[in-house]
């Protein structure tokens, strides 16, 4: 069993940071990588042509281990919105309907909305209302049919942590010939995601949450369906002759194979890339399954103590131990409760009406106990 990894971070000892879904803290060795990278800018003569490509390739290798694909199916971006723009700019129109779920994160939602409007596709947003997580998942499955062009959704709902059965959803998409596009930002790095097994056609992830990377870096997987697509920019770095610096004005029009064409320009990002690479290496060192187990170990006592007191959580099969919401009684004002937590140095997020809690390996039982006691203090 993985032990608490708090010594690897510089978190304030007096803070109970249960908010990795907001932003992960920087690893100590990530700090060192950033310092070293910044200082290297003093002497640019040390940069060789291969320096512009090596670190990006290492990032692809590490990320491909996490989501179980080939490194050349990975592209690097500055943001998820950049990744989604590449995805939806290359989505073929073959049907009349697109599907998403309610309250998706704006970057992805606006991308599919724009694509649907431009192509005169009906965008069906599947609401939950009072449905259980199980019935909401079933509603999604039942809505996917031969008229469906694309299904876009998160693997974990970013506002309340509801787990979607993306394996079943991906299988249904494949059976009817629909694209399956997934925002993996709130799951990849904290739970096992296998893009091949789940029949995912494109997966886009921000780097600064569960991947322990920096802000302004994101990663994406593109299946073979996108191998011949057109990127949203024409970076010289994405051409097959990019490493031949003396021949760049031969203007080789051929893109790199597979997802390489979708990389953002200036892909190397010499200052931020070392932080991203360090975070991915650390995840692979810990092991995603071990991270899942550790989060479950912390979440289980919380459920055991709070459920008998009337606090509601998702049912077992749809509960994520790394990201979930507290179903507090109606008489508790969530905004005031969030302020109460802040005053106790317990940091969570308020998303809509949800008190969102997100656990990771830098948390310990004391963090959980403090949250439990804070909840008990406001119950009647």
Residue ranges, per PLM feature:
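Pyridoxal 5′-phosphate
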Residues: 1-380
């Amino acid at each position: 069993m993985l032990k608490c990894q708090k010594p690897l971070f510089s978190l304030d000892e007096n803070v109970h940071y249960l908010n990795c879904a907001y932003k992960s803290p920087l690893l100590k060795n990530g700090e060192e990588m950033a310092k070293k990278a910044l200082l290297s800018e003093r002497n640019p003569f040390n940069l060789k042509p291969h320096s512009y490509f090596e670190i990006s390739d290492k990032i692809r290798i590490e990320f491909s281990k996490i989501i179980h694909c080939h490194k050349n199916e990975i592209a690097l971006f500055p943001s998820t919105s950049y990744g989604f723009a590449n995805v939806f700019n290359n989505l073929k129109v073959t049907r009349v309907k697109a599907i998403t779920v309610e309250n998706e994160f704006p970057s992805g939602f606006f991308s599919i909305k724009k694509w649907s409007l431009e192509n005169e596709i009906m965008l069906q947003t599947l609401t939950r209302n009072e449905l259980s997580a199980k019935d909401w998942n079933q509603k999604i499955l039942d809505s996917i049919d031969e008229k469906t062009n694309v299904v876009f959704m998160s693997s974990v709902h970013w506002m309340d942590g509801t787990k979607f059965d993306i394996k079943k959803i991906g299988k249904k998409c494949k059976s009817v010939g629909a694209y399956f596009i997934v925002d993996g930002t709130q799951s990849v790095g904290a739970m096992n995601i296998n893009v091949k097994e789940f029949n995912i056609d494109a997966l886009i992830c921000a780097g600064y949450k569960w991947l322990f990377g920096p802000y302004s870096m994101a990663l994406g997987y593109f299946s073979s369906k996108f191998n011949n697509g057109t990127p949203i920019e024409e970076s010289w770095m994405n051409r097959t002759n990019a490493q031949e610096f003396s021949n760049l004005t031969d203007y080789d029009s051929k893109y790199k194979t597979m997802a390489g064409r979708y990389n953002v320009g200036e892909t190397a990002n010499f200052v931020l890339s070392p932080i991203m690479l360090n975070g991915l290496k650390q995840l692979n060192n810990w092991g995603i399954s071990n991270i899942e187990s550790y989060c479950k170990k912390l979440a289980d006592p919380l459920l055991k103590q709070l459920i008998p007191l009337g606090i509601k959580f998702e049912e077992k099969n749809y509960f994520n131990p790394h990201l979930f919401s507290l179903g507090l009684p109606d008489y508790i004002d969530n905004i005031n409760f969030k302020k109460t937590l802040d005053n106790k140095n317990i940091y969570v997020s308020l998303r809509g009406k949800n008190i969102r809690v997100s656990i990771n390996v830098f948390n310990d039982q004391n963090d959980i106990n403090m949250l439990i006691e804070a909840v008990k203090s406001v119950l009647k």
